Amino acid sequence: MQAPVLMVVGTASSVGKSTLVTALCRLAYRRGLRVAPFKAQNMSNNAAVTADGKEIARSTAVQAAAAGIAPTVAMNPILIKPEGQRRSQIIVEGRPWQSLTATDFWQRKAQLWSVVTRNLDHLRATYDLVIAEGAGSPVELNLKPGDIVNMRVARYAQAQTILVGDIDRGGIFAQLLGTLMLLEPEERQLITGCIVNRFRGDPSLFADGVTILEERSGLPVLGVIPWLDDLGLPEEDAVALEQPPVAPAHGLIIAVIRLPTIANFDDFDPLAREPGVVVRYIDHPLELTGAAAVILPGVKHTLAARHWLHERGFDNALREFTGAIVGICGGYQLLGERISDPLAVEGSGGEAAGLGLLPIETIFTTAKQTTQTIACAQVPWAGNEPLQGYEIHMGQSYRRGEAPAFLRIIQRGNTPTSADDGCISSDGRVWGCYLHGIFANDTFRRGWLRRLGWQPPTTPVARADPFDRLADHVAAALGPAVLDRLMRR
């Protein structure tokens, strides 16, 4: 017997679908259900690596954690990673498939439907409940013929489907009623109710709005979910960086350069959650003023990012910067002396001089390193605890001369190893490595912050589990009767 599917679709991108699925996964887990998330297709450069070295969207991995299980590629069989220049790398079942333009992908999309159904069927045979997430809007009419992620999934699974709208962006009636109007009759029959998300203020003030929605749609409003600040969960898309949360007026400032095709920017969430630390995403060298450190993040297209840095005037600004400079993955490659792409792995190929802040050279190859990784930092301030993280990269970087490595890798996947990674300048001010997630290691993160002059709070700040906090918030808005209906087996 196949498990039922509960599906969440939204009126647009960024209305809270991923967050709601995360909450529902935790609520189902707390009820003793074996539950798994599913998103047929995701578009994001924020990726996670599974235990068997495959890529899925970071948001899906977060949902799996909320469900109390390890993430697998079945939960996100298709991942689209924008590369710039109107091309994207298509990851199918965790491995690179093709680098395609949007037109090429559209023409070849139909052959991926069997990938979607095979993986969804596997989850339904393994778990008690699957909670699926759509993408964008289910009624982009010009895109519906190629749909493999929204209502086609709902129809295939005969999923009980929730429609979510974001009242904070305005136009909630047009969002929800307009979407329902544009659904096909057989699709509309699958909608079990609507959720009004991100309401600021007392939800009871929207009582008339609930009545209007229910009378005009003929469907129940399952809940009005109030705005919740500081979720403590990774954002899925780089659009979140365009509207950063209000930061404290003072504190230790860490500048992160908002490079084109920025990837895995959730690397820096643990820094932002430390009391007295301000993470500021910047686009211009003048914004380096007052920063104790600057970080170059991962990117999907390193050579394009290098040209962007030069055009924006960051070359001299970074060479003259007196604080700490860090590069993670693609950012590490940018800190070196030369970047070469002889096989056009990133698209157009070519080579460029790096920033020249570390004595390394990077050469791109077609082999892609995707592993969960354990390493030891080769610096005294990092402590002796092994560092947990992951690698996702296609280039290999080679240190020149006697330049010291920053990390010693001791395990990739389940295989013990011994390999150097990264590089650090002779004065310790500039360093970089390929290890994503490095700042999630508490001893390492706080050791580095102390070097920058950060003073930890005298009394540790207690933080509630973000999954339980989110789940409690959503449960209070929906109520037990609605949750019972949504999670019936």
Curated annotation (Swiss-Prot):
Do the record's keywords include Transferase?
A: no
Q: Name one GO molecular function term.
A: catalytic activity
* Domain (GATase cobBQ-type): residue spans on this chain: 251-444
What PROSITE patterns does this protein map onto? GATASE_COBBQ (PS51274)
InterPro entries in the record: Class_I_gatase-like (IPR029062), CobQ/CobB/MinD/ParA_Nub-bd_dom (IPR002586), CobQ_GATase1 (IPR033949), CobQ_N (IPR047045), CobQ_synth (IPR004459), GATase_3 (IPR011698), P-loop_NTPase (IPR027417)
This protein's pathway reads: Cofactor biosynthesis; adenosylcobalamin biosynthesis
Entries under PANTHER family matching the protein: COBYRIC ACID SYNTHASE (PTHR21343:SF1), DETHIOBIOTIN SYNTHETASE (PTHR21343)
Family membership: Belongs to the CobB/CobQ family. CobQ subfamily.
Which protein, by its recorded name, is this?
A: Cobyric acid synthase
Please report the organism this UniProt entry assigns to the protein.
Chloroflexus aurantiacus (strain ATCC 29366 / DSM 635 / J-10-fl)
Question: What gene codes for this chain?
Answer: cobQ
